[in-house]
């Protein structure tokens, strides 16, 4: 069980029978949004509230084409599109060498008594490598391009598109710098796709922002590893 992503929360007040709006997956399908791409397949497989059909089945009835990997996404046709590419959070593109996360320094006994005494052993630097779980997973840039293509199928269509590289934050919570950096790279590549679109659609407004910073992104002014190429 992942302590960050699999929390049990009482959502009974949000049930439709209790006056709520229902699950987020049900709200998404009910909204009629034209394109939705990401992870979270497990939230669409339970029965919809008060129904003998799953949320996924209701999505198909509502006209959504369902795709579940990069190959299917790349070959998808016109119309409303629902892409669910993993049971929960999507795998990241990069990971630390042998799946390493950032490790804590190891202070000596004297250094624990006072920072000016003894010594501190620092972790060895690590390389980033491709994540072996990142198989047939669509890149954020592919999802961005697909969404832009779908949203401009009809002439003069006005639209709002939100693109998020959520695992920049999620990987930082687990001290997985390579995962976070790889997802930042993905976001940069998707921005390039959007900027290219804007060149031929000059009335496009692109906003790039972050909802908060991360302690993992704070580095000392004089890095301990400045001599490493």
Residue positions per predicted region:
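A post-motif C-terminal structural segment
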Residues: 2-229
